[in-house]
Design a protein with these regions (language model features):
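Surface segments flanking catalytic/ligand-binding clefts of nucleic-acid enzymes
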Residues: 16, 20-22, 150-295
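Short gly/ser-rich loop at a beta-strand->alpha-helix junction or flexible surface loop bordering the NTP-binding
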Residues: 1-171, 285-295
Length: 295
């Protein structure tokens, strides 16, 4: 009777699978498996996610890598990277793993207290992970990603500020600048990005403003310019779904009855963020003028 081959795990080292009899050497080049990194594979039917790639990367590191940045955030439950994004790791002293397709290896200093064991390697603790998010990539994205980490309560602005005290790491100036722009109240990455762009344009509305009229709650809005009584709303995809449209119409009518104007920003409009900011600036000026004439 033919001996049944061992089941393949979701990620595995090819030579180990061959040694254990789960695969033949030729199978590593065939349709049964998909290569994730050199020598590391998954069965073809397994859905490849960024978290799976992180686990695959752990099999390349032999205890000398620290998963960090957006990759560590994914493992900790905040989806900041896709299956096609490279896995972010820091190489510890003695590490012989070099940068390769799908693996972003950085050789920078990291304190022993800044990471903990995970899989076959280590994972950055939340403050170090967030520092690496804040200090890398475009500033607008860094703030948006850090907002999501803060909203998930993996760390806080206060803990990050304390972590930054006395540090002189490469990227610390940029990380401090980005942290100053963070706001855990942001409910979506587009809102975060819009807030940062408005900030640099000299526009400073109150995020997640709660609006009342005659002592009664009217609505909580994405951004509110209180002096001008202007609301700026990011109109996400959910607004066009089912009964959400009807609820939105009622909400908009209540805001207008309370004396507020509404300016919408859509996903499609954010393709040209400079135009979006110009339009918001114009809406603020018009609202300010209307208020002046009203009084």
């Amino acid at each position: 009777m033919r001996r049944k081959r061992p089941e393949l795990p979701e990620v595995f080292v090819g030579r180990d699978a061959v040694r254990e009899g789960a695969l033949r050497p030729s199978d590593l080049r065939g349709p049964r498996v998909r290569r994730l990194f050199r020598g590391v594979y998954c069965p073809t039917g397994v859905r490849v996610s960024h978290e799976l790639r992180c686990r695959a990367a752990a099999l390349t590191g032999e205890g000398t890598l620290v998963l960090t940045g957006r990759s560590a955030a994914v493992v900790r439950g905040v989806d900041l990277a896709s299956a096609s994004d490279p896995v972010d790791v820091i190489a510890l002293p003695g590490c012989r793993v070099n940068r390769r397709p799908g693996l972003n290896v950085r050789r920078v200093a990291i304190d022993a207290g800044d990471h903990q064991p995970w899989e076959q390697i280590a994972i950055a603790r939340p403050e170090r992970m967030t520092f690496d998010v804040l200090s890398t990539g475009p500033l607008v994205r860094a703030v948006a990603d850090a907002d999501r980490i803060l909203r998930a309560k993996l760390t806080t602005v206060a803990r990050m500020a304390s972590y930054f005290e006395g540090r002189h790491d490469h990227g610390i100036v940029r990380a401090r600048e980005a942290l100053a722009l963070c706001d855990p109240r942001a409910e979506s990455p587009p809102e975060s990005k819009l807030r940062v762009r408005m900030h640099f344009a000299g526009l400073h509305p109150e995020p997640q403003l709660q609006i009342y009229a005659d002592g009664e709650f009217v609505a909580r809005v994405d951004f509110g310019f209180e002096e001008e009584r202007l609301v700026v709303e990011y109109d996400g995809e959910w607004h066009g779904q089912g009964s959400a449209i009807a609820r939105d119409r009622v909400r908009q009518n209540k805001l207008r009855q309370a004396g507020w104007q509404i300016h919408f920003v859509t996903k499609e409009m954010m393709v040209n963020p400079d135009v979006v900011i110009d339009e918001i600036y114009g809406a603020v000026l018009r609202a300010r003028s209307a208020r002046a004439h009203h009084f």
